[in-house]
Amino acid sequence: MASRPSAAKKQPAKKAAAPAKGPVKKAAAKKAPAKRAPAKKAAARKPAPQPAPNPTNGVYRLVRALWLGLAHGVGAVFRGIGQGAKNLDPAHRKDGVALLLLGVALIVAAGTWADLKGPVGDLVEILVTGAFGRLDLLVPILLGAIAVRLIRHPEKPEANGRIVIGLSALVIGVLGQVHIACGSPARSEGMQAIRDAGGLIGWGAATPLSYTMTDVLAVPLLVLLTVFGLLVVTATPVNAIPQRLRQLGVRLGVVHAPETDEFTNDDERYDEQWREALPARPRKRAQPAAAEPYDPDAAEQEALSRRRGRPRRSAVPQPEMNRPMDAVDVAAAAAAALDGAVLHGMPPSPLVADLTQGVSTGDRESTTPTPTPVPAARPQPGKLKKDATKAAGGEPAGGAVPDLTKTPLPKERDLPPRAEQLQLSGDITYSLPSLDSLTRGGPGKARSAANDAIVASLTTVFTEFKVDAAVTGFTRGPTVTRYEVELGPAVKVERITALTKNIAYAVASPDVRIISPIPGKSAVGIEIPNTDREMVNLGDVLRLAESAEDDDPMLVAFGKDVEGGYVMHSLAKMPHMLVAGATGSGKSSCINCLITSIMMRATPEDVRMILVDPKRVELTAYEGIPHLITPIITNPKRAAEALQWVVREMDLRYDDLAAYGYRHIDDFNRAVREGKVKPPEGSERELQPYPYLLVIVDELADLMMVAPRDVEDAIVRITQLARAAGIHLVLATQRPSVDVVTGLIKANVPSRLAFATSSLADSRVILDQPGAEKLIGKGDGLFLPMGANKPTRMQGAFVTEEEVATVVQHCKDQMAPVFREDVTVGTKQKKEIDEDIGDDLDLLCQAAELVVSTQFGSTSMLQRKLRVGFAKAGRLMDLMESRSIVGPSEGSKARDVLVKPDELDGVLAVIRGESEG
């Protein structure tokens, strides 16, 4: 009872306090923004109880770490092996594939022939027997044959695709027929029934045909597929089946071989070579070579068009030569030319008369007898002109190229040997040397691991220097590889050229040459030397189809350019050439290839040569060849006289051209052969075709030191006028300075070939531009023919001394040389007439010209102008006094000049011994 009142008293107090809650809350709400009570921190969670340590966890971690370490180690080993296999030589890869096939063939043979037990035997039975059925015994033989072919012919990878397609068609066709012959078992009869027939391959080939059409139609279709596969494997077109069967009969002795000459056999080998599939070319549609019917003529035209689709390797297209190479009877015509009848008061050229002497009876008896083959047919000039027109075409259109290589290696093929017999006299025939005298070179590389590494290095350089450029491709040559770099938008070409030293540092090669841009392309070229250089053999260049089809006797093989194409050019179209380079740069090899090319293609009736060799050792191998018009000249003074004789010969030829109204010696020779040109009535002269005259000076510097004025005047006159007369000049020097290769000589010698030089100044003297100082030597050169804007980098061809000796001996056996006695006879007369002059003839001529032109005879002037000493100047003045050019000495006064300027030519002629007065 006492507790209830207290409770009652408490309840009103609660009610009284209740109305006061509202205002209090509002007041609290107003004060809340001013001061907020801090939030209570969450109670910290108690840490979970740690489990007791388990001893097996440490073992697990140890095992896991060991396993991962082992996996990483094995992976690193295999990655290293894979990287090494990637850099493996392609020949080793091919050998590895062949040996792998031999191993597989051995395992399959053990499983099918010897009933191998174990898991491997069961696998062979499941795979091989299940796939090939009853013919599983032939699978090891097939694999072994493929492996043997890969080992024996690793250089013909282009035929692998054709053989795979042919074998596939052959196997499918045969197994399909076997399946039908065994009753066409179905899958419902069990796998063993299919194995006893044609296997899964035969079941898959025959079942659809038998289901959709009867076996009567399925069997002929499978037979056609088999025949097609056989033809593709043997590379035999349908129209050549009778010929192949005939050849097979001849080999087996069933059919007698038809009587054919060596040229027919060469043509058969020529066609046989073209039946091989052509390699897959970039920018061409990808299609197996055996998927089209084969036409030999069409294949030949297609191959030539592919080669001529890109610009000819020689910088100027080769037009046709209007000089038929048929057999010509020279003896009777040249004998009549010896009569020396005068035409319009001008004697005939004595050069034509040499060919009548021919080979004496003793020479013919002493020489080795040669068989007399039938003359080979020559291509028609019209066809050559048409082919030359095609050769001027542009780049073939095509799609993208999967790899970076731009130009594949040119496909070589065997050609009929050039053994044309040309009649040089009544009973003597001249046989050109065979191409077998020149060795073949090895197959070139289109790509190597070093090229890929350089591409990566170039890309790294562009990335590091923040140049928006990318390597889009490269073309590999025998000496250097040219990498094509395309620039991004608004990127200056100078940014690439400024990185020359950085690029050289990145690729570890100091000889880096940048071409900006590549002619005909919107790309910058970076030429970097190859670490594995290739040899370019002269025989490979002369075996090309273009060389065999062109009848130009002046066509010369120079080498191979940076794109892998062979460089050939006609000296008749150049028309004169300057070859220069430092010692060891390849200049002598170039001269050897030039002379050997002429001997391989031209007879002495076509080309006569004058060789000047002041060194006495460079051209001695060619002594005695019938193409020479005079023995090899080693005396520089006699060389100057020979050049003067060439000028006189040129004038005689021009007299004939002017008299008969022809502008070029080729037109005149053609008219003579066709009988359109006849001497005037009463003349006993019989006109003869003029041969080309090739003058080769091996060292121009030696000539310029002995007789600079006479040599320069003769060279300038020859180079200015001799092209139309069929006279061509090749000048070689290893000191291309301005006092040797003068401005007048450069102005009249349009074609240049520069090998490695020692300075930039020498490069400018030869090419009028830099570049030769960056060449790497040993045949690496820059070829600038007439009409080209920029030089072409090439690797000069090489011919060994043994090959030169073989060709020279063949030419000597055909004909003995017939020399001219008047080529250097002027020197003997000069010594007899001017004995007191001695070796001062050139200085005396210069002194006389200086004194007469200035009308001032002073010894001190001669010292200053001619840069001679007082004794030499006084002797020159005495010589001029003895020839009445100047008067006697009058002390310190100048001597009187007794000759007027208009009489200077006569005075110089008297000094040189050209006149008796």
From Swiss-Prot:
<comment type="function">
    <text>Essential cell division protein that coordinates cell division and chromosome segregation. The N-terminus is involved in assembly of the cell-division machinery. The C-terminus functions as a DNA motor that moves dsDNA in an ATP-dependent manner towards the dif recombination site, which is located within the replication terminus region. Required for activation of the Xer recombinase, allowing activation of chromosome unlinking by recombination.</text>
</comment>
<dbReference type="GO" id="GO:0015616">
    <property type="term" value="F:DNA translocase activity"/>
</dbReference>
<keyword id="KW-0812">Transmembrane</keyword>
<feature type="transmembrane region" description="Helical">
    <location>
        <begin position="163"/>
        <end position="183"/>
    </location>
</feature>
<feature type="domain" description="FtsK">
    <location>
        <begin position="564"/>
        <end position="764"/>
    </location>
</feature>
<dbReference type="InterPro" id="IPR036390">
    <property type="entry name" value="WH_DNA-bd_sf"/>
</dbReference>
<feature type="region of interest" description="Disordered">
    <location>
        <begin position="277"/>
        <end position="324"/>
    </location>
</feature>
<feature type="topological domain" description="Cytoplasmic">
    <location>
        <begin position="237"/>
        <end position="917"/>
    </location>
</feature>
<comment type="similarity">
    <text>Belongs to the FtsK/SpoIIIE/SftA family.</text>
</comment>
<feature type="region of interest" description="Disordered">
    <location>
        <begin position="352"/>
        <end position="426"/>
    </location>
</feature>
<dbReference type="InterPro" id="IPR002543">
    <property type="entry name" value="FtsK_dom"/>
</dbReference>
<dbReference type="Pfam" id="PF09397">
    <property type="entry name" value="FtsK_gamma"/>
</dbReference>
<feature type="compositionally biased region" description="Low complexity">
    <location>
        <begin position="391"/>
        <end position="400"/>
    </location>
</feature>
<protein>
    <recommendedName>
        <fullName>DNA translocase FtsK</fullName>
    </recommendedName>
</protein>
<keyword id="KW-0132">Cell division</keyword>
<keyword id="KW-1133">Transmembrane helix</keyword>
<dbReference type="Pfam" id="PF17854">
    <property type="entry name" value="FtsK_alpha"/>
</dbReference>
<dbReference type="GO" id="GO:0005524">
    <property type="term" value="F:ATP binding"/>
</dbReference>
<keyword id="KW-1003">Cell membrane</keyword>
<dbReference type="InterPro" id="IPR003593">
    <property type="entry name" value="AAA+_ATPase"/>
</dbReference>
<feature type="compositionally biased region" description="Low complexity">
    <location>
        <begin position="8"/>
        <end position="22"/>
    </location>
</feature>
<dbReference type="Pfam" id="PF01580">
    <property type="entry name" value="FtsK_SpoIIIE"/>
</dbReference>
<keyword id="KW-0159">Chromosome partition</keyword>
<dbReference type="GO" id="GO:0051301">
    <property type="term" value="P:cell division"/>
</dbReference>
<dbReference type="InterPro" id="IPR050206">
    <property type="entry name" value="FtsK/SpoIIIE/SftA"/>
</dbReference>
<feature type="transmembrane region" description="Helical">
    <location>
        <begin position="96"/>
        <end position="116"/>
    </location>
</feature>
<dbReference type="GO" id="GO:0007059">
    <property type="term" value="P:chromosome segregation"/>
</dbReference>
<keyword id="KW-0067">ATP-binding</keyword>
<feature type="transmembrane region" description="Helical">
    <location>
        <begin position="216"/>
        <end position="236"/>
    </location>
</feature>
<keyword id="KW-0238">DNA-binding</keyword>
<feature type="transmembrane region" description="Helical">
    <location>
        <begin position="126"/>
        <end position="146"/>
    </location>
</feature>
<comment type="subunit">
    <text>Homohexamer. Forms a ring that surrounds DNA.</text>
</comment>
<keyword id="KW-0131">Cell cycle</keyword>
<keyword id="KW-0472">Membrane</keyword>
<dbReference type="GO" id="GO:0016887">
    <property type="term" value="F:ATP hydrolysis activity"/>
</dbReference>
<feature type="region of interest" description="Disordered">
    <location>
        <begin position="1"/>
        <end position="56"/>
    </location>
</feature>
<dbReference type="InterPro" id="IPR027417">
    <property type="entry name" value="P-loop_NTPase"/>
</dbReference>
<dbReference type="InterPro" id="IPR041027">
    <property type="entry name" value="FtsK_alpha"/>
</dbReference>
<feature type="binding site">
    <location>
        <begin position="584"/>
        <end position="589"/>
    </location>
    <ligand>
        <name>ATP</name>
    </ligand>
</feature>
<dbReference type="GO" id="GO:0005886">
    <property type="term" value="C:plasma membrane"/>
</dbReference>
<feature type="transmembrane region" description="Helical">
    <location>
        <begin position="65"/>
        <end position="85"/>
    </location>
</feature>
<feature type="compositionally biased region" description="Basic residues">
    <location>
        <begin position="23"/>
        <end position="44"/>
    </location>
</feature>
